[in-house]
Curated annotation (Swiss-Prot):
Gene: purC
Family to which this protein belongs: Belongs to the SAICAR synthetase family.
Entries under InterPro entries matching the protein: SAICAR_synt/ADE2_N, SAICAR_synt_PurC, SAICAR_synthetase
CDD domains listed in its UniProt record: SAICAR_synt_PurC (cd01415)
Top EC class for this record: ligase
Protein name: Phosphoribosylaminoimidazole-succinocarboxamide synthase
Pfam families: SAICAR_synt (PF01259)
Keyword Zinc: no
Keywords assigned: ATP-binding, Ligase, Nucleotide-binding, Purine biosynthesis
Pathway annotation from the record: Purine metabolism; IMP biosynthesis via de novo pathway; 5-amino-1-(5-phospho-D-ribosyl)imidazole-4-carboxamide from 5-amino-1-(5-phospho-D-ribosyl)imidazole-4-carboxylate: step 1/2
GO biological process, one term: cobalamin biosynthetic process
E.C. numbers: 6.3.2.6
Catalytic activity, reaction form: 5-amino-1-(5-phospho-D-ribosyl)imidazole-4-carboxylate + L-aspartate + ATP = (2S)-2-[5-amino-1-(5-phospho-beta-D-ribosyl)imidazole-4-carboxamido]succinate + ADP + phosphate + 2 H(+)
Any single Gene Ontology cellular-component annotation: cytosol
Length: 236
């Protein structure tokens, strides 16, 4: 019998039969900016399919990640990873905090993608943290920060091209990384998920928002957009 290890707003982690493996289950829950959790029936199944597909694609281009295989409609088998206490946010277009905090026009295209680090803490509302703080807190080494940034930009470039090929614009995405020990060395590994829950996705021509951004204002249309993204990725 599997044992629950962790329960988040949209995913649950369980123990697996083998050491250093876990089962990650996707729920239908979505979290709003207010902290309220709402249910979007079927979202978990779609996110499992989308994330499995994208992690497989990233593996093909040499991006180490925790995904091993999809077990069923909602669950996947993953590698245990010592997750870093920071999220990596890559943005190529002004959205979210750039509009709220800097007064930028939504949709303004940056010359180059911007990388932000945020503390993985809902309690403290995911504050921005800089590289000097990360080093002083001993969360990552200088080499690890460099490797994470390089991988994050490579992942973002690949995903941007993939989504553009199906008429969807990747505006921003949130990535999580960690380390896996390999003898005396450690490997930097992509973890968590890549889905409409942690990617800002817009229609390429109309800039109509898709995925999690609809949970706030148009929750009745959220499932349709998740389904649209999944269907378009099937074409790849």
């Amino acid at each position: 019998m599997k044992t629950q290890i962790y329960k988040g707003s949209s995913k649950i982690l369980y123990s697996a039969e083998e050491d250093f493996l876990l089962i990650m289950a996707f729920s239908d829950n979505g979290i709003l900016e207010s902290g309220e959790i709402i249910e979007v029936s079927g979202k978990g199944v779609l996110n499992n399919n989308i994330s499995s597909f994208l992690m497989d694609k990233l593996e093909m281009i040499g991006i180490e990640n925790h995904f091993i295989e999809k077990i069923n409609m909602r669950e996947q088998l993953i590698q245990y990873v010592e997750v870093f206490p920071v999220q990596v946010i890559i943005s190529s277009v002004a959205c979210g905090r750039f509009v709220k905090e800097f007064g930028m026009d939504e949709g303004y295209v940056f010359d180059k993608p911007i990388i932000d680090f945020k503390v993985r803490s809902r309690e403290f509302k995911y504050p921005i943290v800089n590289e000097y703080q990360i080093l002083n807190f001993s969360w990552l080494t200088l080499d690890e920060i460099k490797a994470v940034k390089e991988q994050a930009l490579r992942i973002y470039a690949f995903l941007s091209g993939l989504f553009m090929g199906v008429g969807i614009r990747l505006v921003e995405c949130k990535l999580e990384f960690g380390r896996v020990l390999n003898g005396e060395e450690s490997i930097i590994m992509l973890t968590d998920e890549i889905s409409p829950d942690n990617c800002r996705l817009w229609h390429i021509h109309s800039n109509e928002k898709l995925g999690f951004e609809l949970l706030e204002n148009k929750p009745n249309k959220a499932f349709e957009s998740y389904q649209l993204i999944a269907d378009r990725l099937k074409e790849k």
